[in-house]
Structures are given as structure tokens and as C-alpha cells.
């Protein structure tokens, strides 16, 4: 058995009440001293409503208590005793259940407090994220506007660049046309002809192309008014037009060459002075060949 107030195991003597509850001596004295009520059914208790009982009676008390009592009374007493025991077990089970429920309620309250705190944190975080999403949406809108403005500026700059490229191409074409126009008169005024190469093989090219050069009159300057002499005068047998001067390793200059130069206003070789350097160079190159033909009668001075 257990005390219905403190639920401690009862040993020895206990106090039973008329309301069918069992108390320990300490709790019963507290109730009587304070004029309190039963802790189970809240019935006001007094000393007359309480009776001390022996929890573990001896054999002698059992034999003396049952003596002289009719079986009907014994059966009725046994029934009440059994019902009291069942009531005590029910109270004990209820106490245990209440205790478990209290523990579970305490745990649930703790968990509810934790979950409430978590929910508050989640709600706060949700509000922060909502504000941040609004800020991000505003920022995206601003960036979209900036992007549109930059696209418009880029399109304008691209259009200006294309226009500048077109202007540059036009100016370049005009510059090229002006350049070609400026170079064209010079090419027309000084016509160029394909001249023979005198220096690749002089001994062969000069002899082969001599007649061609003589026939090509485009190398000569315009004719000078007045009498003309031959470019290559005929050979004279006078003593003044002597042979080549071997001592000086150069051909002798004819004596009448100076008189002819002084008496005429145009050069000996038919050119116009320094006006036509190509004709002068050609005459200077061909003059030894002509003189060598005129002096074939001279013996060979050098032999290979």
C-alpha cells in the first residue's frame, strides 16, 4: 500500500478515512492540525472520520478479529476490503499516469518553447529574406535600366563608328585618286622605254643591239635648228687626227674636235647637253667601239 498524499510505501500503522483513502501518520497529523481536506477527494476530515489500521497484522489479531462474526458480515467486510484495495490500485495507476503525463507535458512544453523560438528565428529570417528579395528586385530593375541605357549608347557609338569608317574610306579613296592624278602627268611627260641591259654581258649585248639602238630615235633630244654634222665623222688621213696614244693608254683626241665644239652650239654626240643624260651615256659607251672599228689596221697590242 501507498500513502494517498505522499505516495510512499506504508509500513506498520496507517490512517484510513471514511472517504476510502489511506494516509500515513505524518500526513494525517498535518491534515488534522490544519483542518484540511482530503488530498484526493477534497472532503473535510476530522479525527472522528479517521481510524488507525495495522497494515501488517499478526496471526493473533486476525484470529481474534474474525471470532464471533457471522459469515455474511465477513463476506461484506471482505468485499469492502477488496474494493478498497482496487480503489488504491486505481489511485496508484492514476498517480503514475498523472506523473507520466506531467513529465510528458513538461517535455512538450520545453519542445514547444524550443520550436516557438525556432519559428521566431525562421520568421525573422523570412522577413529579412523578403526585404532582401525586394532590394534585389529593385537592384535588378536598376541594372536593367542601366543595361538599356548602355545598349542605346553602344548603338549610337556603333553608328558613329560606321559613319567615321565610311568617311575614312571616302577620304582614302579621294586621296588615292588625287595621288594617281598627281603622278599621271609625270609618267605621261617622261615616257619610259625598255632599255637594253648593257652591263650583264657588255661584249655581246653592245654588238647585237647596236643597230637597234641606232634605229631607236626616242633616245635623242629634239633637233636643234641649223646645220647638222654627222655624229660620227668620217675618218681623216691628216696628221692631226693621229692614232691612239699608246703611251697614255687612251685614244688620241682629234685636233678638229675642239674647233667643232667651239664653232657649233650643240654637242658633238647629237644630244641636247645635259638635257638627255641617257643619250650622253649611250654615246660615251659606244664611242670606243666606233673607234676600234676605224682603227682595225693597228696591230694587236695585247694578246690573251
Curated annotation (Swiss-Prot):
E.C. number(s) listed in UniProt: 2.3.2.27
Observed effect of gene inactivation: Normal vegetative growth but fertility defects leading to reduced seed number per silique, due to abortion of male and female gametophytes characterized by abnormal tetrahedral structure becoming either asymmetric tetrads or polyads containing more than four products, because of impaired class I crossover (CO) formation during meiosis.
Single biological process term from Gene Ontology: protein ubiquitination
Keyword Nucleus assigned: yes
Gene3D superfamilies membership: arf6 gtpase in complex with a specific effector, jip4, Zinc/RING finger domain, C3HC4 (zinc finger)
Catalyses which reaction(s): S-ubiquitinyl-[E2 ubiquitin-conjugating enzyme]-L-cysteine + [acceptor protein]-L-lysine = [E2 ubiquitin-conjugating enzyme]-L-cysteine + N(6)-ubiquitinyl-[acceptor protein]-L-lysine
Ranges of Polar residues composition bias in the record: 235-250
One of the record's GO molecular function terms: zinc ion binding
Pathway: Protein modification; protein ubiquitination
Keyword Nucleus listed: yes
Top enzyme category: transferase
Chief place where the protein resides: nucleus
Expressing tissues: Expressed mostly in flower buds and roots.
Superkingdom, taxonomy of origin: Eukaryota
Transmembrane segments: none
Residue ranges, annotated region (Disordered): 218-279
Protein's job: Ubiquitin E3 ligase required for class I crossover (CO) formation during meiosis.
Protein name (Swiss-Prot/TrEMBL): E3 ubiquitin-protein ligase CCNB1IP1 homolog
Organism: Arabidopsis thaliana (Mouse-ear cress)
Amino acid at each position: 500500500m501507498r500513502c494517498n498524499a505522499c505516495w510512499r510505501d506504508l509500513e506498520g500503522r496507517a490512517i484510513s478515512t471514511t472517504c476510502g483513502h489511506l494516509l500515513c501518520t505524518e500526513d494525517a497529523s498535518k491534515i488534522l492540525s490544519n483542518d484540511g481536506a482530503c488530498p484526493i477527494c477534497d472532503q473535510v476530515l476530522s479525527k472522528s472520520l479517521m481510524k488507525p489500521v495495522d497494515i501488517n497484522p499478526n496471526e493473533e489479531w486476525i484470529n481474534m478479529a474474525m471470532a464471533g462474526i457471522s459469515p455474511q458480515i465477513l463476506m461484506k467486510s471482505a468485499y469492502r476490503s477488496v474494493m478498497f484495495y482496487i480503489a488504491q490500485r486505481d489511485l496508484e495507476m492514476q498517480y503514475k499516469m498523472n506523473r507520466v503525463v506531467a513529465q510528458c507535458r513538461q517535455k512538450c512544453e520545453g519542445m514547444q518553447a524550443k520550436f516557438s523560438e525556432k519559428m521566431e528565428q525562421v520568421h525573422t529570417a523570412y522577413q529579412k529574406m523578403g526585404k532582401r528579395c525586394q532590394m534585389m528586385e529593385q537592384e535588378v530593375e536598376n541594372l536593367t535600366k542601366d543595361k538599356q541605357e548602355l545598349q542605346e549608347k553602344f548603338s549610337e557609338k556603333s553608328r558613329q563608328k560606321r559613319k567615321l569608317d565610311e568617311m575614312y574610306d571616302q577620304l582614302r579613296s579621294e586621296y588615292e585618286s588625287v595621288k594617281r592624278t598627281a603622278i599621271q602627268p609625270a609618267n605621261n611627260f617622261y615616257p619610259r622605254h625598255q632599255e637594253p641591259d648593257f652591263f650583264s654581258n657588255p661584249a655581246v649585248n653592245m654588238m647585237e643591239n647596236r643597230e637597234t639602238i641606232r634605229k631607236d630615235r626616242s633616245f635623242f633630244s629634239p633637233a636643234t635648228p641649223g646645220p647638222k654634222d654627222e655624229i660620227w665623222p668620217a675618218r681623216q688621213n691628216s696628221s692631226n687626227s693621229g692614232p691612239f696614244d699608246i703611251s697614255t693608254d687612251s685614244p688620241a683626241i682629234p685636233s678638229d674636235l675642239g674647233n667643232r665644239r667651239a664653232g657649233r652650239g650643240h654637242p658633238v654626240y647629237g644630244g641636247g647637253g645635259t638635257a638627255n643624260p641617257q643619250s650622253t651615256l649611250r654615246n660615251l659607251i659606244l664611242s670606243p667601239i666606233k673607234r676600234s672599228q676605224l682603227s682595225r689596221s693597228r696591230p694587236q697590242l695585247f694578246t690573251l
